[in-house]
Amino acid sequence: TGSRGQYHIHNLKEIPHARIVAVCDNYAPNLQQAVELCPGAKAYTDYRKLLESADIDGVIISTPLNWHAPIVLDALAAGKHVFCEKAMARTLDECKAIYDAYQTTNQVLYFCMQRMYDEKYIKGMQMIHSGLIGDVVGMRCHWFRNADWRRPVPSRLRGKPCKPTA
């Protein structure tokens, strides 16, 4: 439920028949923000517990890449529809495992290309496809923004080494 998850929350809230019944994050500040955005949604810190819930039809996975394959596989095994951020997985073996698992289900599995549904990009593609700007023979793109895409690190954690959990 970090920045990407909250982006999806805002989009889901625009869909009349969509209901956000649960949110999950192991980072408390992000989870709290998501709970505030989704009154009535149950909060989870462990995605496996969320997947056990019978009132959840599908999940949106917007975790760091190393978690995509495990969560997608667990969600498919739990009978959930899956919408996952790109990239599909870290390795070809993980991608194959996801594909093989998907083939055994009747679930929807979709991998999101972040800007594919952004109005600015859609308008640009419409202009290209309509011929309005002529033949495109080259393109250069720069992306400037005034915020860091990574989640903030609380000041109490800055400069401290990570400790193994096991």
Predicted regions mapped to residue ranges:
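N-terminal Rossmann-like dinucleotide-binding module
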Residues: 1-38, 118, 128
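Predominantly a Rossmann-like dinucleotide-binding segment in NAD(P)-dependent oxidoreductases
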Residues: 107-110, 115-166
